[in-house]
Amino acid sequence: MPLLDIEGHLHSAQLIDEEGRKRFLKGKLGESFFTTQELSNAQVIGIAEGVATALSVTQVEGFPVVAAMSCTRFRTIVPLIKKHYPQAQIIVLGDCGHGEAEAKSVALLNNVPFVSPSFSEEQIALFKKLTRTTNSPTDFNDYYVVKGILYE
């Protein structure tokens, strides 16, 4: 996945192997991010932690989503996108668990909405069955899988 700055210059890329392991090419992440669609005329822009969530939300909801590439990068990416796209409503799309507090904090700090999925015990069990793992669901990609909108 290419990681571009606000002007479209390539800074790095995230590689994901067949086992789902992620790594970045050498380069400076700085203010770079991945985006699912052009942002310049967007009325709504989501900002997610990772690429899977960004792609899933765009596919289902139809608006562009930026992947910050980690929860700690929300502090850089949210104000950057808000500043450069003042016409758009910015929505922070948090994951459940580890990065949720960071995402909420950044959304509050930047006066933008925060949303994250929630899962019932039944949905957690269904997710584990559908994905044949012991992992619990954590993000909107997982939410759409559980809801039967996307398939793992």
Indicate where each model-derived feature is located.
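TOPRIM fold recognition
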Residues: 43, 55-152
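Phosphate-handling DNA/RNA-contact segment within nucleic-acid enzymes
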Residues: 1-85
